[in-house]
């Protein structure tokens, strides 16, 4: 009888783990940084792309949202 944990099974499990970490943690963190730097100067097309990224990576955004909470910036009024 062969072992349940063959080399191929371990490799497939590591691929699944790395893809899930990438989808749930790494890419949403990069998107948070991108949104934080470009939110107030984005064009309408770029804003639509931002909304797409938010909806596509929503589970990761939801997972990171308690830890990364960016407050809106104050407006600078010129007298």
Curated annotation (Swiss-Prot):
UniProt main location, coarse: membrane
Enzyme class: translocase
Ranges that cross the membrane: 10-30, 48-68
Membrane topology of the entry: Multi-pass membrane protein
Keywords of this entry: Membrane, NAD, NADP, Plastoquinone, Quinone, Thylakoid, Translocase, Transmembrane, Transmembrane helix, Transport
EC number(s) reported in the record: 7.1.1.-
Catalytic activity: a plastoquinone + NADH + (n+1) H(+)(in) = a plastoquinol + NAD(+) + n H(+)(out); a plastoquinone + NADPH + (n+1) H(+)(in) = a plastoquinol + NADP(+) + n H(+)(out)
Gene Ontology CC terms: plasma membrane-derived thylakoid membrane
InterPro entries reported for this sequence: NADH-quinone_OxRdatse_su_L
Location within or outside the cell: Cellular thylakoid membrane
GO molecular function, one term: oxidoreductase activity, acting on NAD(P)H, quinone or similar compound as acceptor
Similarity section: Belongs to the complex I NdhL subunit family.
PANTHER family, sorted: NAD(P)H-QUINONE OXIDOREDUCTASE SUBUNIT L, CHLOROPLASTIC
Protein role: NDH-1 shuttles electrons from an unknown electron donor, via FMN and iron-sulfur (Fe-S) centers, to quinones in the respiratory and/or the photosynthetic chain. The immediate electron acceptor for the enzyme in this species is believed to be plastoquinone. Couples the redox reaction to proton translocation, and thus conserves the redox energy in a proton gradient. Cyanobacterial NDH-1 also plays a role in inorganic carbon-concentration.
Subunit structure: NDH-1 can be composed of about 15 different subunits; different subcomplexes with different compositions have been identified which probably have different functions.
Protein name, UniProt field: NAD(P)H-quinone oxidoreductase subunit L
Organism: Microcystis aeruginosa (strain NIES-843 / IAM M-2473)
């Amino acid at each position: 009888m062969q072992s349940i944990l063959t080399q191929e099974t371990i490799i497939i499990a590591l691929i699944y783990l790395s893809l899930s970490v990438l989808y749930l943690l790494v890419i949403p963190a990069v998107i948070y940084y991108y949104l934080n730097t470009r939110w107030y100067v984005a064009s309408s097309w770029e804003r639509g792309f931002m909304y797409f990224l938010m909806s596509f990576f929503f589970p990761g955004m939801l997972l990171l949202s308690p830890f990364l909470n960016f407050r809106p910036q104050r407006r600078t009024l010129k007298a």
